[in-house]
């Protein structure tokens, strides 16, 4: 061997081929360039580099885990008990300071990103919907008559997730993976349907005062927890191949309108965007009034479609066509 090629990626945050590798649909990813350098080396150098204790990190430096273990056995003195002596990255009080917020935001972006990459997840089907919608067998426990009437959407969510996961399995479970908020109600139904089909699914949980253990149907290795709503919503969309919105409350509408706004303003490609339950959504939101008032354009009403059943949603997604991105905003 006379030479080997080492490829190095330079980007602000993400690998150079991230958008192509996932079929990314968002405008969040920075531009990146791939630089290839050919380095002349001898055979012994190659062997030494690639056999260093089977170390995949490719460097000879002492790792953080070793130091964490080492400091556990230091003598117990006034100095070693002092907060100043703690390793910065293991010091919870330090990590929770206001000044460390940028670091915490970055960590919440990186951890799920790296773990989803490791699992080979390329694209997702996003399910938004209410946590209070019960399954039909338990609709008698619903807080209101309307929630009981909406319980059939639990079954539609479950069936849609089952059908989509059967399709996902054709790609080895890498494409069209169901992702929910990981909680009860519609979210539970989505993860449950994926499990019905023998596939895996993602849960993006958020720490709330009144909730929530993840529902029992999320794939454990793909069950994440967030402090920041903004980063959680970003992860919902970074691999989104389609977005399905079921009846829900403020949280569902927050997720729905942020996603629609990104598409409307050309910050995200126009992916299939389906609202389950036309009667519910037309009662809750007067879409035509927004267009009549001129606060949105008539063309904005074409960014989404109403559906009632799982099969109808599958058919629309299959026939949606190639995602496009707006280069201007109608009405501006």
Each predicted region: which residue ranges?
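Phosphate/pyrophosphate-binding betaalpha-module
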Residues: 178-180, 184-246, 250-253, 257
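C-terminal functional extensions of proteins
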Residues: 275-332
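Short hydrophobic targeting helices and cationic amphipathic motifs
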Residues: 15-18, 29
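Glycine-rich beta-alpha loop segments
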Residues: 61-75, 79-204
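Compositionally biased, intrinsically disordered low-complexity segments enriched in Pro/Arg/Gln/His
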Residues: 2, 21-22
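Short, low-complexity, charge-dense intrinsically disordered segments
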Residues: 19-20, 37-40
């Amino acid at each position: 061997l006379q030479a080997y090629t080492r490829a190095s990626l330079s980007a602000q945050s993400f690998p150079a081929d991230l958008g192509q590798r996932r079929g990314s649909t968002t405008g969040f990813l920075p531009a990146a360039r791939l630089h290839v350098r050919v380095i002349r080396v001898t055979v012994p150098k190659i062997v030494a580099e690639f056999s260093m204790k089977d170390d995949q990190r490719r460097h000879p430096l002492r790792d953080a885990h070793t130091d964490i273990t080492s400091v556990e056995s230091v003598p117990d003195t006034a100095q070693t008990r002092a907060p100043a002596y703690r390793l910065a990255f293991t010091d919870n009080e330090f990590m929770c300071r206001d000044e460390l917020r940028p670091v915490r935001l970055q960590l919440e972006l990186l951890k799920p990103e790296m773990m989803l990459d490791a699992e080979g997840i390329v694209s997702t089907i996003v399910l938004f919907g209410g946590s209070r919608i019960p399954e039909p067998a338990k609709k008698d426990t619903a807080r209101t008559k309307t929630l009981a009437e909406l319980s059939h959407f639990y079954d539609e969510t479950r069936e849609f997730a089952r059908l989509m996961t059967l399709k996902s399995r054709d790609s080895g479970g890498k494409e069209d993976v169901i992702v929910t908020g990981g909680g009860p109600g519609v979210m539970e139904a989505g993860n449950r349907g994926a499990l019905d089909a023998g596939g895996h699914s993602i849960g993006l949980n958020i720490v709330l005062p009144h909730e929530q253990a993840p529902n029992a149907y999320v794939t454990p290795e793909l069950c994440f927890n967030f402090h920041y709503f903004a980063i959680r919503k970003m992860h919902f969309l970074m691999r989104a191949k389609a977005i399905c919105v079921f009846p829900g409350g403020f949280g569902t509408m927050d997720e729905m309108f942020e996603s629609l706004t990104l598409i409307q303003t050309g910050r995200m490609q126009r992916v299939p965007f389906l609202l389950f339950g036309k009667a519910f959504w037309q009662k809750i939101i007067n879409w035509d009034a927004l267009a009549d008032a001129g606060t949105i354009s008539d063309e904005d009403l074409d960014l989404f479609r109403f559906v009632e059943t799982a099969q109808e949603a599958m058919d629309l997604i299959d026939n949606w066509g190639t995602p496009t991105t707006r280069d201007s905003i109608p009405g501006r």
